[in-house]
Amino acid sequence: MPTPHLIYFADPMCSWCYGFSPVLDDIRRAFGRTLPVRVVMGGLRPGTETPMTEAAKLEIAGHWRHVQDATGLPFDAGGMARDGFVYDTDPAARAVVVVRHEGEELASSYLTRTQRAFYAEGRDVTSGEVLADLAVELGLERTRFLTEWASEEAKAETWRDYAISQHAGVAGFPTLVAGPNEEGVYGVVTRGFAPPAQVLEVLKDWMARIAA
């Protein structure tokens, strides 16, 4: 039977995924490498071309306040406040896919770093240069990262992630799936945000059952 693992369907520019990032940290602390996490990009708004209106910015800022109230995480709307900002989630998602070539753990760390850059630091993570800066922070070589990020192969791989999400019936983010059990079946741990204690309880119960 394949090693039990988690599949995390997420998007770097999904505010509730940012809110869920401390939960993933708790999962890593609780289970370590006995329960590895594979990150799959869900595709929140890939290919968006129209700049945000001021009304849309206000609406999304309201959603961010809900996440902040629920999680206590910091928010800075500077990344979205720029004139002509296009909320295209594909560049950041593709960056995570490129980093994933270096390993799942690094991809997960890069996802978290990108979320923090956008939501807490107000940086424009639709920019390849910003995404490269973040990759360099984690030890990647800048030119190689940008070359891979701009490649047709990376674009195609990212859209395959979106297709996997759709095929799996994932309709919202974050979604966390665990599997396989003794019958080879995968099950949903949470659809949408859930507090750490709830998620850890579900996972501990699941791990105990498949180990029995």
Residue spans for each PLM region:
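A generic fold-level signal
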Residues: M1, D90, V170-A171
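Short pre-active-site segment immediately N-terminal to redox-active cysteine/selenocysteine motifs
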Residues: A10-M13
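General structural signal for secondary-structure boundaries
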Residues: M1, T53, P74-D76, P195-Q198
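C-terminal cap of thioredoxin/glutaredoxin-like
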Residues: S21-R29, R113-A212
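Extreme N-terminal starter segment of soluble prokaryotic enzymes
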Residues: P2-I7
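Short, cysteine/histidine-rich loop/knuckle motifs that typically chelate Zn2+
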Residues: W16
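Structural alpha/beta surface segment adjacent to cysteine/selenocysteine redox centers
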Residues: G19-Y119
